């Protein structure tokens, strides 16, 4: 089985980190090696440009892949997005020079030149708006084009907006929001190998939002402590061998709520509270 992942750009490092946490590691890393065995039997990692990954998966050269939602849409390839991986978040925006005076797409004059590598998305966008612009294809940094007179505006990926600001550009419309996605050939949607890959990644994503809270609770405080815990399916409770009646309580808690919950647990009578990272979470 082949798993194609980004070889460069904003998605590469985050993808390798996610795979590592899911227990999938390349046998070695070499920028010259584009097909690398993994530590999993019969699973090879293929490194490719993010924009090429949709057609690599569709063609059957790889069964699954990771790339950006924007690249999937731009490619027009017949693949299925089966998991939002919650990293590489960005927006595809229409941007113009700050001093142009243009505030809305409808204000673009006829023949306005738009530099972008997202030709298909841009064409569809302007056709739906009924705007007569000229789309200029670029393969590198679109944001420099208005500054050198090669274009009047751009459609490009924006993460923080710093690069646009640096080049004197301002966004006037958000075309779409994007993030990294796990994609698969549609005829493999029910393939057990694909389900295994999805489950491995999904368990890590779920775990990243949770903390495991363990505590000892005196018998008389148990009811009050249980009222505090918003566990997924109820906390795990077991009797502790001690001089006074005591319970061990374990629960998975949302990371964003952990600080408030610890205070409430302490006030409710919980003792010896431990907060642990969760590596994987499978509901």
UniProtKB/Swiss-Prot annotation:
EC number(s) per entry: 2.4.2.17
Keywords, alphabetical: Amino-acid biosynthesis, ATP-binding, Cytoplasm, Glycosyltransferase, Histidine biosynthesis, Magnesium, Metal-binding, Nucleotide-binding, Transferase
Single GO cellular component term: cytoplasm
Pfam family, one: HisG_C
Keyword Ribosomal protein: no
SUPFAM superfamilies noted in UniProt: GlnB-like, Periplasmic binding protein-like II
Broad enzyme group: transferase
Pathway: Amino-acid biosynthesis; L-histidine biosynthesis; L-histidine from 5-phospho-alpha-D-ribose 1-diphosphate: step 1/9
Sequence similarity: Belongs to the ATP phosphoribosyltransferase family. Long subfamily.
Species in which this protein is naturally found: Ignicoccus hospitalis (strain KIN4/I / DSM 18386 / JCM 14125)
Protein name, as recorded: ATP phosphoribosyltransferase
